[in-house]
Amino acid sequence: MGENPAKSHYAQLNLGEENEMEIFGYKTQCCRKALCIAGYILSCGALLLLFYWKPEWDVWANCVPCSLEEADVVLLRTTDEFRIYSRKNVTWISVSGIIKSRLDYPSFAEEDSIFSKALMKPSLQVKSIQVQKIRYVWNIYAKQFQKVGALEDHHTCSAIHTKFGSGLTCSEQSLRRVICGPNTIDVPVIPIWKLLIKEVLNPFYVFQLFSVCLWFAEDYMEYAAAIIIMSPLSISLTVYDLRQQSVKLQRLVESHNSIMVTGRNKEGFQELESHHLVPGDMVVLKEGKALLPCDAILISGQCIVNESMLTGESIPVTKTQLPQADNLKPWKMHCAEDYKKHVLFCGTEVIQTKGDDRGVVKAVVLQTGFNTAKGDLVRSILYPKPMNFRLYRDALRFLMCLIAFAAIGMIYTVCVFALNGEEAGEVVKKALDVITIAVPPALPAALTTGIIYTQRRLKKKGIFCISPQRINMCGQLNLICFDKTGTLTEDGLDLWGLLPSEGNCFQDVRRFPADHSLPWGPAFRAMVVCHSLIVLEGKIQGDPLDVKMFEATNWVIDDSSGHQIEGQRSTHATVIRPGPKANTASVDGITILHQFPFSSALQRMSVIAQETGGEKQAFTKGAPEMVATLCRAETVPSNFESKLLFYTAQGFRVIGLAYKSLQSGKQSTDLTREEVESDLTFLGLLIMENRLKRETKPVLEELSAAHIRSVMVTGDNIQTAVTVAKNAGMISPTNRVILVEANKIPGSFSASVTWKPLKENKTEDDGNLDSGSQTGRRIRLAAEPGQFHFAMSGKSYQVVAQYFSHLLPKLLLNATVFARMSPSQKSSLVEEFQKLDYFVGMCGDGANDCGALKVAHAGISLSEQEASVASPFTSRTPSIACVPELIREGRAALVTSFCMFKYMALYSTIQYLGVLLLYWQLNSFGNYQFLFQDLAITTVIGMTMSFTEAYPKLVPYRPPSQLVSPPLLLSVILNILFSLGMQILGFLMVQKQPWYSKTDIHSACLSVNNHVENSSSASSLGLHGVGGGDPTEVDNGYKSYENTTVWLLSTINCLIIALVFSKGKPFRQPIYTNYVFIMVLVGQLGVCLFLVFADIDDLYSKMDLVCTPTTWRISMVMMLAVTLAVSFLVEEAIIENRALWLWLKKTFQYHSKSHYKRLQRVLEQDSAWPPLNETFSLDAVTVSVEEDMEGHSNPTFDSNEDAL
């Protein structure tokens, strides 16, 4: 049913956000509701169950479309490819108990606030809905639902200081408390009965209930009883697991809801519990450690916080107060990407506070409850984003095909039994029975079996996963983005030297640690104070770069409070003093008065410091090219660029230093960043060694050999990044590096892009960080169609993405190095790679890479935390060796899923074909025969087939990602035909045997006791004869020569396909390494052969088998042996023959439809690509890329179709 697109009926919720939804208004109609209730009763609840599964049908049946303003029910639909519906009832919040009269409106809410705009007058009610724990209220004026529980974004910096700096009034607090709800992240432990009902109503168990009822009606007591025993056990285990998760999550958040805070309103300070806080409240942060109960904007003072809960990194982060800017920009726009530097996030720990001039640290509550950072984390756990992996979609489609297959069998069954004069009730039972045989309800669940065991193996290797459904995706990864510092290179940098500048000329380089005699001066003072280090439990903590720089000075941090600073009141400040090993200095200490923390967007940090009895000075440290632009031109050496290139080309990490003296009279906290970071004096370059981790080269070599492309995404200098890429083996020494520079033309809406070869700088031996001769054999980049690599900065990437978007895919195809990238640019880059149909992995340290780690198909955070919200995967070992490990396990899990899927599909089909054959003679399998096949064979195989571990070597192609690929479909179809052929052959041949008799089932074996009959099994089927209608016939129940033959052949055939489908190399270990599985198969085969050759009357009677001559038993074994040989030969010689499929693709000129592959073929024909030493302006560029490159297909051998 389509939706009315009328504006009043339809709107968008959370536009542009990750959880964007469409919302439709509906009004309940009494007559429709009455008809639905009647339908529930008449259908015995089946209609109600259907509406439970499909909430949109429930709304469409019970309600009529209306405007959102009139709606009492809303229907929500996600805007992703899944289009998932959910139903929510509209509720009303009454505030009449707070607002007594119309005259009180102004004192409760400002006119421009959502609280005023949502209040319906004169009823004094607010219309609201709650979606995924977030409350939305109806904005009467904007005619839309808006989120509450957060401070409005339109406030300016100055407005936040003036409006909320002294707190809200009691009446404002009361109104906001009622509308926003309590500041709690309330995750109640779900009662067991609720979990039980939810699990029982799962379609899988509903189908099982239907099957059990049908089996009881047909007297299939044993199998039905087995299912009744197994299902509650399975449900109980699932409910227990869900309950444990619920308890664990509740423990994670319970401390959040019981924190005491000091708040302030217009009447003064007050102690209150954190759940009373509302957006706009002002809280005072006291000294000492504390957990934050909400997101808050720091408006005075400074805080050191531990954000490991958010990023996985335990490095302390400095938060500074929001500037009091006098412009009309909203505060987030004014602060741009740096707004987080002023925000204290819920769930993080305040380690240390530093008061302002009045000794107070104040913050304004920004967001409460589930709107906070911690609330967002909890919601992501409660409502995980579904993954669009075609394997699961194909599984459901295949299930639909099996249902259609079963429908054919039902028609056949009805015809056979009806033509033989069976009762209508019996015909219906038999027809329905076909569905329970042909359609295994566990088929989609079979795809997850490999994931469960893989997750356990990963945990043993120190790789933790909070999103198991992404494990299969790891098997498809063909491009990995790596952060540089701390990921490819060592986290702890070594200080190599200082290149001081004086009088706009560089002086001699001062090496570390050989040269300890650093002279006292501005450059030395910059190294002493320009950092964000703190002393925590007696140890200096902070950024590793800052730690190395500071330790080289031999000064110490005296981090105590109450230092008297000339011209100011007593304040909490950090004082740096000379240590015992420090050189003689002319001052007793330097006090850090204020700090502007490092910003990835600005590429620098600054501090304001004051020597004891001296003047205030500002010191800046950051990217050299950025720092140089902030300095007076006459202080920057003329050979600045060549010197910078000299060191960065060797792989050094280079930091620029600058300073200036500040005029007295203005308080440090009143100075803006722009005032401080201007007209600086350039001090020199700090040179740090950026050594590769020992695992980097072997891992990148392994990925390259597997044709998995590696890309570097870093915040460092482009020359340093290119050098590290060369040393690591990402770029071969014989390949060209082309620098892409894009610039926006000032004062216009146009831009230009230039391609030029990157300058090579031959360096002296003593400066080489990592000589090329030491790298051994170089690695050829896996995915490069040409012998060149693009390198670009974050600024150029942004300009290309904005002005030359049609060129971006062509650049990304060969881009290997991205330098000076901000966190948002990293996320954008990953998304752009995904648009080219790459399966993208991202490996970083979890701090500045958070966004990219979440966006990537597989984000891997290198962190000491067991699990980080920064990414789906966390490696406790800080090494990229986890990347190939994860890919190996992902490939193994993916192949296991395919093996299980094929086995489940074939097992049900074999049983289905056997039953239909016997239906021709109005016969079927016996209860214990079904029981043996389903439990003793299939269940045990399903549990042990997934034990096979990953193959240790990564091969240069990926496993298939879709079930509808030609090799897999051919494998399934051929094996179905082999099984069908063998069963029909056995069925017909047994009837041609001289000892065969329809009526005398003991004629073949004279040694059997005279005509022992199983009266109990005979009565259980309730059939009358075998088509001939001979009145002298004896009813033998299920027992017949056809039954014995078909059942034995089909049972052992299940073992054959289990062995044939259990893939080993190249993605999993050989099958013989799975000892448990091999023992199971051998044991099951032994039991089956025993049933074939045994002559035990009681056993045969129980299993509804009849005795046959030994020659016929040997004939059955020979048929099975031929089937095994043919199946194995076809699987190995055709299905798994990679060379054959590549030849077929080449013969029929099949090409991958993946966007990047199509683009490669286009560029291979373009002799003018890449352009060198050319500049394109915006209006001069023509589009040469195919316009219709949409869609995604990743057939079986898509990853490297031309290489092999």
Swiss-Prot record:
Membrane-spanning residues: 33-53, 220-242, 398-418, 434-454, 898-918, 930-950, 968-988, 1044-1064, 1076-1096, 1114-1134
Residues the entry annotates as binding Mg(2+): D845, D849
Extracellular compartment spans: 54-219, 419-433, 919-929, 989-1043, 1097-1113
Keywords for the protein's UniProt record, in alphabetical order: ATP-binding, Magnesium, Membrane, Metal-binding, Nucleotide-binding, Phosphoprotein, Translocase, Transmembrane, Transmembrane helix
Positions of the catalytic residues: D483
Record-stated family: Belongs to the cation transport ATPase (P-type) (TC 3.A.3) family. Type V subfamily.
Protein name (database record): Probable cation-transporting ATPase 13A4
Lineage: Eukaryota, Metazoa, Chordata, Craniata, Vertebrata
Gene that encodes the chain: ATP13A4
